[in-house]
């Protein structure tokens, strides 16, 4: 009989968190959700508590935690409600927990994910920023505390499945020539530059293949998402940037490929549904039911591949540059992007200004070595401040009076 895995799901109300709970619900004999966490979505967390009866529910926002606690009390549920970043770290490292789904979006996910690593947990990593901002620190922590790590991003999970089973982090000794990292290209991969300048947040969030949150949908539209995944792949698989080839594949059927020195190319295919990599990681090394519809290969009929256009999507170029420079630059890239996407989603800037903000911030901050988490967070903070100050001075965001439409201090992302 397979022992029950006890889970903490960091970011349970997001799209990855909900998909994880969908898979968990299909296997009540294998998984138990002990702790669920969210930022401030009280209603969704309340519904999850009613269905899964977790021992702990953590809301990052203190006011939301109070609201949730009141609702649970009325409902007669005994879930303990906690709040704040320290509580996220606590439930990620509980002694009774063996598996942590790290699905918090953004830099807020770094500290609890590191806590899980320091506690030697089995980590299912969906939070990009942990590797993008603190890749060396995180991977060193995984090794130091003998934690285990499985990637949840569909592309990295596909690479993991396509590499040799006992891959040791060395492409040459494993007979691997390069990694082929696929990208859908997002909703605008054929759009001209003039069209891109008029893109609305609603259009950017309408991904043709995947169901995702708003922030990652915009990242997909700018191809920053793929740039961040290049950085992730570097740390996950110990692959240099020049050995990672991005391939635009609009159908999102092939999730990534590994090319070997004998000419073989191994690929992982499947319907674009995040429950597939989630189920793979939850059940590993076994295979478990995910609820994903069987792929109709005859209906697909045709698969297309294109080289990425760095002029149309400069965010991808900027990500490669940040990885090549190393040090604090990936953290700077990520923070500037988070600010830029936030103001774009608020309708404050055009779509094409997103890479301009990021490039300005990267040019304004000198490269520095990263030695600990404090260095990472300092780089993150400085990049955000630099982005906000630049935003506050730009002519395109001024009203008829000439005053800025918003001031930098309004944005605390």
Curated annotation (Swiss-Prot):
* GO BP terms, alphabetized: isopentenyl diphosphate biosynthetic process, methylerythritol 4-phosphate pathway involved in terpenoid biosynthetic process
Which InterPro entries has this protein been placed in? DXP_reductoisomerase, DXP_reductoisomerase_C, DXP_reductoisomerase_N, DXPR_C, DXPR_C_sf, NAD(P)-bd_dom_sf
Obligatory cofactor(s): Mg(2+); Mn(2+)
This enzyme's EC code(s): 1.1.1.267
Q: Where does 1-deoxy-D-xylulose 5-phosphate bind?
A: 128, 154-155, 184, 207, 220, 225-226, 229
Q: Which Pfam families match?
A: DXP_redisom_C (PF08436), DXP_reductoisom (PF02670), DXPR_C (PF13288)
Q: Give UniProt keywords alphabetically.
A: Isoprene biosynthesis, Manganese, Metal-binding, NADP, Oxidoreductase
The residues listed in the UniProt record as binding Mn(2+), with positions renumbered to this chain, are 153, 155, 229
UniProt record similarity statement: Belongs to the DXR family.
* Described function: Catalyzes the NADPH-dependent rearrangement and reduction of 1-deoxy-D-xylulose-5-phosphate (DXP) to 2-C-methyl-D-erythritol 4-phosphate (MEP).
According to UniProt, the name of this protein is 1-deoxy-D-xylulose 5-phosphate reductoisomerase
Q: Which organism is it from?
A: Nitrosomonas eutropha (strain DSM 101675 / C91 / Nm57)
């Amino acid at each position: 009989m397979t022992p029950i895995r006890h889970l903490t799901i960091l970011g349970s109300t997001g799209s990855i968190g909900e998909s994880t709970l969908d898979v968990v619900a299909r296997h009540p004999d294998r998984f138990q959700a002990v702790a669920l966490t969210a930022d401030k979505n009280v209603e969704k967390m309340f519904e999850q508590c009613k269905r899964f009866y977790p021992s702990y529910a953590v809301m990052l926002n203190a006011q939301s935690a109070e609201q949730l606690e009141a609702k649970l009390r009325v409902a007669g549920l005994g879930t303990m409600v906690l709040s704040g970043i320290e509580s996220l770290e606590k439930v990620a490292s509980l002694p009774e927990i063996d598996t942590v789904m790290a699905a918090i979006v953004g830099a807020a996910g770094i500290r609890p994910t590191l806590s899980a690593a320091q506690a030697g947990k089995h980590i299912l990593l969906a939070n990009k920023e942990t590797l993008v901002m603190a890749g060396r620190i995180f991977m060193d922590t995984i090794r130091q505390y003998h934690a285990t790590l499985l990637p949840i991003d569909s592309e990295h999970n596909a690479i993991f499945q396509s590499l040799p089973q006992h891959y040791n982090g060395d492409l040459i000794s494993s007979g691997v020539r390069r990694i082929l990292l696929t990208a859908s290209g997002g909703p605008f991969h054929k759009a001209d530059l003039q069209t891109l300048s008029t893109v609305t947040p609603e259009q950017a969030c309408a991904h043709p293949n995947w169901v995702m949150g708003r922030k990652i949908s915009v990242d997909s539209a700018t191809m920053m998402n793929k740039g961040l995944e290049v950085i992730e792949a570097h740390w996950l698989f110990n692959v240099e940037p020049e050995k990672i080839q991005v391939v635009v594949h609009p159908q999102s059927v092939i999730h990534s490929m590994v090319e070997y020195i004998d000419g073989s190319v191994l690929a992982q295919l499947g319907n674009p549904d995040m429950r597939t990599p989630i189920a793979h990681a939850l059940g590993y090394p076994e295979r478990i039911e995910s609820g994903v519809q069987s792929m109709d290969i005859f209906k697909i009929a045709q698969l297309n591949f294109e080289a990425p256009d760095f002029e149309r999507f400069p965010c991808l170029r900027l990500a490669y540059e940040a990885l090549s420079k190393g040090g604090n630059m990936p953290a700077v890239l990520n923070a500037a992007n988070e600010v830029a996407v936030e103001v774009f989603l608020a309708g404050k800037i055009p779509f094409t200004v997103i890479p301009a903000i990021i490039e300005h911030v990267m040019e304004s901050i000198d490269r520095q070595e990263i030695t600990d988490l404090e260095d990472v967070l300092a780089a993150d903070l400085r990049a955000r401040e630099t982005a906000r100050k630049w935003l506050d001075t730009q002519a395109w965001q001024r009203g008829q009076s000439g005053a800025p439409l918003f001031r930098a201090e309004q944005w605390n992302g």
